[in-house]
Swiss-Prot record:
Organism encoding this protein: Arabidopsis thaliana (Mouse-ear cress)
Domain remark in the UniProt entry: The HPR motif (90-97) is required for intracellular targeting at membranes.
Record-given protein name: Temperature-induced lipocalin-1
Sequence motif: HPR (Hydrophobic proline-rich), positions: 90-97
Effect noted on mutating P94V: Impaired subcellular localization
PANTHER family: APOLIPOPROTEIN D
Amino acid sequence: MTEKKEMEVVKGLNVERYMGRWYEIASFPSRFQPKNGVDTRATYTLNPDGTIHVLNETWSNGKRGFIEGSAYKADPKSDEAKLKVKFYVPPFLPIIPVTGDYWVLYIDPDYQHALIGQPSRSYLWILSRTAQMEEETYKQLVEKAVEEGYDISKLHKTPQSDTPPESNTAPEDSKGVWWFKSLFGK
């Protein structure tokens, strides 16, 4: 078994430019998201204390599921884009903290496309500022993931609408049933 090289992460990430809405173009399946989720996206907002408010949303069977959390630099003294994200689960009774790694492996110079991973290579996200991504750009990000040692056979594209839904107009799955069902592979 060959040892995988350490992943390269972005250095000098401009956190303020990174804030805003990002659409999930593709990802590895996650037990924290419904298998049939569409229009999945994340919205990041800088808090006054320097942490980041995280809002992850997805739509499943016409209902909006969401979870909120926070992100912060894993090592405040490092210029590497290695963040920690923390969510409290389950969403309907948020009492258990779950912390994970969020490493920015690539960001284009205009901050329009990003590749996000973490050290175990169990999770991977391709993100875009727009709901659709040019195929050539997608292929370049997939190639970057391969270079970083990811098994892209697990990567699946996330269906995105041409006109993404608005958060305040969709019925909510307020009980977090999507999260609970996703634990059982539904």
